[in-house]
């Protein structure tokens, strides 16, 4: 039985992108990459994983059925200043380079589907590997519906593990919130 770390990659990147306090764009990008690499290393080590799978975003099929799906994100993006747009372009160039590094220079798996979000890919991976253990790395509460005896979620922002047993502090392994 293998233990997979399934990384909601864009979710992790966006969290890392907004952590750094530096004003210099190169320093902020460097800090975001540092946070991503160290986050994956921490989960790999703490959960004694066998393999890491980076799940990437594609265009959501949900937009074909429900036009307002995540439409507010475009509205917010359009309100950004020119500098913010330029910074985002640089961040996403670094993100693309990092994904290429993971795909070409490591033994990790990188998966993407043009018409599916990372959430969908993670759900399918778990479905296709029912006899293995899975650690989802994301802050997205949508993953709670995937919890099973062989599936947990690690939230690096709160340092909590979500499982069928509830929300546990990753350091103390004590319950922090009752299961809903």
Which ranges hold each PLM region?
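Feature 3881 marks metal-assisted phosphotransfer/nuclease machinery
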Residues: 162-180
